[in-house]
Amino acid sequence: MYKIGIILGTRPEIIKMSPVIRELTTKKFFLIHTNQHYSENMDKIFFEELNLKKPDYNLNIGSGSHGDQTGRMLMEIEKVLLKEKPDFVLVQGDTNTVLAGALAASKLGIKIGHIEAGLRSFDRKMPEETNRVLTDHISEFLFAPTKTAANNILKEGISDEKIHIVGNTIVDATIQNLKIAEKNEKVCKFISKITKNEKYFLLTLHRAENTDNFEILSKLVTSINNISKKYEKNIIFPIHPRTHKKLNEFGLINKLENNHLIKIIEPVGYLEFLGLEKNAELIITDSGGLQEEACILNVPCVTLRENTERPETLDVNSNILAGSDPENILNCVEKMLKSNRHWNNPFGDGNSGKIIVNIVFGEKKP
């Protein structure tokens, strides 16, 4: 029987791979978790929350420089693949786990399927862009979420025969996991307690290009304060550890903490966060995944970046690129709050997981 290996290492990958894992329950497959960001114990709860099969292999790689982390992953993944001998390996996204998994499989002559293939920011300074491009070029099956992504791959000289436009599994995941969240009493109580059932904006900030540069981070802090004062709305800010560290280092944290409208909270679980997204009036972020989820949930999004690998969100007007200039950010917030919230979702109908599994086992286009 055809045997599949799934390789993942971060929570966004677990989320986006969850529909595929659910579709594989009647098939022969195993799950490798590199633990790129979190410990085995922390992610154990995450798998349980989403009612997913626990990983067969936890590699406990942890953090490190890009070369160190990718190299250790490559060695450990290779050991598992030699033992399991899968016919096919699936990876999702653009992390070091994805590149290491694809390289390990490629060196062993194992077929690779890249889910979310073809995304391009066209910014080679981003480590994720390198991972995306390299993984696409060594994969046999490229599961592109949209026609735009497929065209990016074609322009790089990859054969049309390898490309399958399947939609984005984030649609499946958001629909499936939102149902779990809405039935979870603990999650519902948390949302009510944090929001006090009032309207609010949701903020996330974690990208190195924003957090590691004092000038840019200072502008963003000014912008956040300006937004809260202009609209007199609570801004709920689940703060990323690296962002918290940098705000402290640069002496900027007090500028946020002294504003009673900015609610800085610890990072929250995925189901809780999904609830916060769904009920927000506006999402302000530098996250790629949140641009997609906001679009799916019909919540306007302001992206604190100069570029995006999700141009489809710009095309349907669910998202706008604001950069880091305070005046421009304020203008973008105003524009999105006035926008029509009923756009067409460009990422598919929520059946991407099923389509991908059918292609893997039938090796045919949908």
UniProtKB/Swiss-Prot annotation:
Broad class of where this protein is predominantly found: cytoplasm
EC numbers, comma separated: 5.1.3.14
GO MF entries: UDP-N-acetylglucosamine 2-epimerase activity
The reaction(s) this protein catalyses: UDP-N-acetyl-alpha-D-glucosamine = UDP-N-acetyl-alpha-D-mannosamine
Cellular component annotations (GO), alphabetically ordered: cytoplasm
Broadest EC class assigned to this enzyme: isomerase
Protein family according to the UniProt entry: Belongs to the UDP-N-acetylglucosamine 2-epimerase family.
Protein name: UDP-N-acetylglucosamine 2-epimerase
